[in-house]
Amino acid sequence: MARQNDMGREGESEARAYLVKHGYNVLHTNWHWHHYELDIIAVKEDELIVVEVKTRSEDFLLSPEDAVDTKKIRRIVAAADAYVRYFNIDLPVRFDIVTLIKKETGFLIDHIEDAFYAPCR
């Protein structure tokens, strides 16, 4: 489990660097609200972007984005709503997923913009 946690932290660090390199202003990482967590919150072009980061090893059977199921989406949206209210943010919100596959020489990164929308309640 420790190896998996280390890889996850390394993946989040790589995802953050990737976003900064591509013009995102990262506001917070690992922001907690109750038992929920937002991996990365950033702003780009007057839009608040909530980024879920998924890191996997090369030999993992499922693709990283498949781990973002309906339950996970609801938690991310609830935490994002709390974030917007807490910081009194008046920007449109976009939900992205950054996937990282660990290779021998580093990470293969895929950035999925508008990966999902907030479900209707």
UniProtKB/Swiss-Prot annotation:
Annotated HAMAP family: UPF0102 (MF_00048)
Determine the domain of life of the protein's source.
Bacteria
Q: Which InterPro entries match?
A: Restrct_endonuc-II-like, tRNA_endonuc-like_dom_sf, UPF0102_YraN-like
Put simply, this protein is called UPF0102 protein BDI_2565
- Organism listed in the record: Parabacteroides distasonis (strain ATCC 8503 / DSM 20701 / CIP 104284 / JCM 5825 / NCTC 11152)
Molecular function terms in GO for this entry?
Answer: nucleic acid binding
User: Which family does the entry's similarity section mention?
Assistant: Belongs to the UPF0102 family.
